[in-house]
Amino acid sequence: MANVTLNVTDAKGQATGTVEAPEALFGVSAEDVQAHIPLIHQVVTAQLAAARQGTHATKTRGMVSGGGKKPWKQKGTGRARQGSIRAPQWYHGGTVFGPQPRDYSQRTPKKMKAAALRYALSDRANAGRVAVVEFGITEPSTKAAVAALAPITADKFTTVVFTRDNINEWLSVRNIPTVHPIFVDQLNTYDVITSQYVVFTKEAFEAFVAAKTEPKEA
């Protein structure tokens, strides 16, 4: 399989070279990506569901205090029969079929998550919206980060991927409204599809490719 060529730029946004990205990670065809949109949707839905707190709660008529006494006798008053002032039709009565605490998380196989990420990255790469940047930042500087990203992303919303050693670069971009910084071991399908551009640092790109392509020890 032929690899995908990604541009590498410097701190001023000038092209300095290219890197070869594995086709399996960045070069899936547009037709194949289109065919797997349901998979991407399922993985993203599961990710968003897992992020839900699920602590919502309402009280049923059995949980609301009071209401243990029948408000008036069954017959002879001319009024509608009532058994409790905490029945749902009463003011301050219990809630019927209201939300209760629950776990929204779904089980998603690792292979499905990995495949969805490949398709999402390939979709961005097919559109020319994946790049590698060498920031060269030695101390936190938002101005320097903007100068490096602007020629590539044109101020569109961008996910920038770092290694945990790229702390100065991470600190430099975290205050940019159109940038979502993320560490390479946290890269996921949702953050890719919600961004118009995906930018890797050189170290993050190498770490990502190595983690996805090198065989794991038994």
UniProtKB/Swiss-Prot annotation:
UniProt feature coiled coil, ranges: none
An annotated GO cellular component: ribonucleoprotein complex
Disordered: region residues: 55-83
Pfam families named in the record: Ribosomal_L4 (PF00573)
Keyword entries, A-Z: Ribonucleoprotein, Ribosomal protein, RNA-binding, rRNA-binding
Record GO biological process: translation
Entry GO MF terms: rRNA binding; structural constituent of ribosome
SUPFAM superfamilies xref list: Ribosomal protein L4
Protein family: Belongs to the universal ribosomal protein uL4 family.
HAMAP family the UniProt entry points to: Ribosomal_uL4_B (MF_01328_B)
Subunit annotation: Part of the 50S ribosomal subunit.
NCBIfam families per UniProt: rplD_bact
Function (record text): One of the primary rRNA binding proteins, this protein initially binds near the 5'-end of the 23S rRNA. It is important during the early stages of 50S assembly. It makes multiple contacts with different domains of the 23S rRNA in the assembled 50S subunit and ribosome.
Protein name as annotated: Large ribosomal subunit protein uL4
